[in-house]
């Protein structure tokens, strides 16, 4: 894989990690549609590090606060919200990955993501701010994130939807969702590094790794800041229509054996 291909995958990872449209599903599509080489496990890991860097930069004040106050309510909320994903991920990760990395299943998963995004605005706008979030809220939001073990189910989409249903206001829903993404991204990186050290990763140039990581970080930061502002006044339906269209297109191409 050359540096330009790594740059493209970094853009895809950075934008789609935080827009509610599934990063894993889009990376799968990007490799096929642009006929890119398989990125390799090591580059996948570095792309996740790039998006993690984006979150750290955007939430630098919050992370400094968490370091200074490790037993704060915010830290406990993040721990409670992470528990469902940890349990599901450790128990069923390999099973779900084996059944999900085909065009047909990814197409259906995009349709499911679209359904939840469309239904997000059916409830009345909530008013909960960060200080109002309960541990029950965090656990339920985290449980929705655990569903994103399916590759084309959007983690950010599911957590934002759950947060809106739990009556968080729109800005806080996106804000907490992205903050909660940090443990999930860290967990994915750890699991991928285990595979890397077990010799499952393909070799790739250091230039491609650096370019892909920085690309994911840059575009990830843009996506986080834009999405939080966007959700203040806009519906998630546009994303629902997008992933529905994408899912229908993928299924059509699969059934006609074009893709």
Swiss-Prot record:
EC class name: hydrolase
Membrane topology: Multi-pass membrane protein
Main location: membrane
Stretches that traverse the bilayer: 1-21, 39-59, 71-91, 99-119, 133-153, 174-194, 208-228, 236-256
GO cellular component terms given for this protein: plasma membrane
Catalytic activity from the UniProt record: di-trans,octa-cis-undecaprenyl diphosphate + H2O = di-trans,octa-cis-undecaprenyl phosphate + phosphate + H(+)
The keyword Membrane is assigned to this record: yes
Top-level taxon: Bacteria
Record flagged with keyword Transmembrane helix: yes
Enzyme Commission designation: 3.6.1.27
GO BP terms, alphabetized: cell wall organization; peptidoglycan biosynthetic process; regulation of cell shape; response to antibiotic
PANTHER family: UNDECAPRENYL-DIPHOSPHATASE
Protein's job: Catalyzes the dephosphorylation of undecaprenyl diphosphate (UPP). Confers resistance to bacitracin.
Note: Bacitracin is thought to be involved in the inhibition of peptidoglycan synthesis by sequestering undecaprenyl diphosphate, thereby reducing the pool of lipid carrier available.
Protein name: Undecaprenyl-diphosphatase 3
Organism name: Bacillus cereus (strain ATCC 10987 / NRS 248)
Lineage: Bacteria, Bacillati, Bacillota, Bacilli, Bacillales
Designated gene of the protein: uppP3
């Amino acid at each position: 894989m050359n540096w330009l291909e790594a740059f493209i995958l970094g853009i895809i990872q950075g934008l789609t990690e935080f827009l509610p449209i599934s990063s894993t599903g889009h990376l799968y599509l990007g490799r096929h549609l642009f006929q890119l080489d398989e990125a390799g496990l090591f580059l996948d890991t570095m792309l996740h590090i790039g998006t993690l860097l984006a979150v750290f930069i955007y939430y630098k004040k919050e992370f400094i606060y968490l370091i200074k106050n490790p037993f704060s309510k915010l830290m406990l909320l993040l721990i409670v919200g992470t528990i469902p994903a940890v349990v599901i991920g450790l128990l069923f990760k390999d099973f779900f990955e084996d059944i999900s990395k085909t065009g047909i299943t990814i197409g259906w998963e995009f349709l499911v993501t679209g359904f939840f995004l469309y239904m997000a605005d059916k409830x009345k706008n909530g008013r909960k701010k960060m200080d109002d979030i309960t541990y029950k809220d965090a656990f339920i939001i985290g449980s929705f994130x655990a569903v994103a073990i399916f590759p084309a189910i959007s983690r950010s989409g599911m957590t934002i939807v759950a947060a809106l249903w739990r009556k968080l206001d729109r800005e806080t829903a996106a804000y907490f969702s992205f903050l909660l993404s940090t443990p999930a991204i860290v967990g994915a990186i750890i699991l991928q590094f285990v595979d890397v050290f077990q010799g499952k990763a393909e070799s790739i140039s250091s230039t491609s790794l650096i370019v892909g990581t920085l690309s994911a970080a840059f575009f990830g930061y843009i996506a986080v800041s834009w999405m939080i502002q966007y959700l203040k006044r806009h519906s998630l339906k546009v994303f629902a229509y997008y992933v529905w269209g994408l899912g229908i297109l993928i299924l059509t191409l699969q059934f006609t054996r074009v893709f």
